A protein has these predicted regions:
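A charged, amphipathic alpha-helical module
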Residues: 1-168
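A short, acidic, amphipathic alpha-helical segment used as a generic capping/interface helix at domain edges
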Residues: 51-52, 56, 172-191, 210-213
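Residue-level signal for short, function-critical loop segments
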Residues: 73, 201-202
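Residue-level marker of alpha-helix boundaries and capping positions
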Residues: 76, 175-176, 205
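Short, surface-exposed basic-aromatic patches at helix termini and helix-loop junctions that form
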Residues: 86-91, 190, 212-220
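A donor-sugar binding/catalytic signature common to diverse glycosyltransferases
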Residues: 194-198
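Glycine/threonine-rich flexible loop motifs
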Residues: 204-210
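Conserved small/polar residues in nucleotide/adenosyl-binding loops
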Residues: 221-225
Length: 225
């Protein structure tokens, strides 16, 4: 997230990528020793990462086009699957807006509670999902607090993403990436993106119906996308 936020504006080319590699190395070593996975350690790491990236000198006055990337999970994140779309946009000097992996995990977990609400039932999976969602939301708030305290824009929280899905009336569409793709599109348009690249597998019917089918409704969030 911070790489996408800062790299188009950095004064020293490559400085943001160096920070990413540094923290990837540090976190890998911590995970190898079974550390950094508890809530207290994660909150400390959130703060340290944000403080580290806040030292990068940037020129925010640059005119940079903000483009969102969303779509089916594998195609969205895998350069092999999307033909290095992210690199292509970055080479064009675009500010890439892309949600991370955690919202997808929250979406999958929350699918149990959505099904319970739709069918008027109460299952053990649904109850457990609510507890897990609450835990992840707490960590998400801590992460956003660290971002804001260091002068960065907070990431869109899951509650906001879900509200977009509710507006479409499609929270029951939980096969594959379901309503999440459309919600990410709305989030991107609301947060200033003038274009959205939707990456979908050619033969994935679920992605085409849940995502492409609501493009017109997503465009209601902006008039010039």
């Amino acid at each position: 997230y911070l790489y996408n936020e800062l790299s188009p504006y950095e004064l020293k080319k490559g400085e943001t990528l160096d920070k990413v590699r540094l923290w990837n190395s540090r976190l890998s070593r911590l995970f190898e020793h079974g550390k950094a996975a508890d809530p207290i350690s994660m909150c400390v790491i959130f703060r340290k990462i944000c403080e580290s990236f806040a030292t990068i000198n940037c020129d925010k006055s640059r005119s940079v086009k903000k483009v969102a990337v969303t779509g089916e999970l594998y195609i969205k994140f895998c350069a092999l699957g999307n033909g290095e779309t992210e690199k292509y946009l970055r080479d064009l000097g675009c500010h890439i807006y892309m949600s991370g992996f955690v919202p997808y995990i929250m979406y999958l977990t929350d699918s149990c509670t959505n099904d319970d609400n739709i069918y008027g039932r109460k299952t053990l999976a649904g109850v457990g999902a609510k507890v897990l969602i609450a835990y992840m939301k707490t960590l998400w708030c801590k992460m956003n607090s660290a971002l804001v305290q260091n002068g960065f824009e907070p990431m869109e929280d899951y509650r906001s993403l879900k509200s977009y899905g509710e507006n479409f009336g499609c929270l029951g569409e939980t096969m594959g990436d379901g309503w999440l793709i459309g919600a990410e599109m709305c989030s991107a348009l609301k947060n200033g993106c003038k274009g959205v690249v939707m990456l979908l597998p050619f033969g994935c019917l679920v992605s085409h119906t849940c995502a492409r089918g609501i493009i017109k409704r997503c465009l209601l969030y902006t008039s010039d996308a």
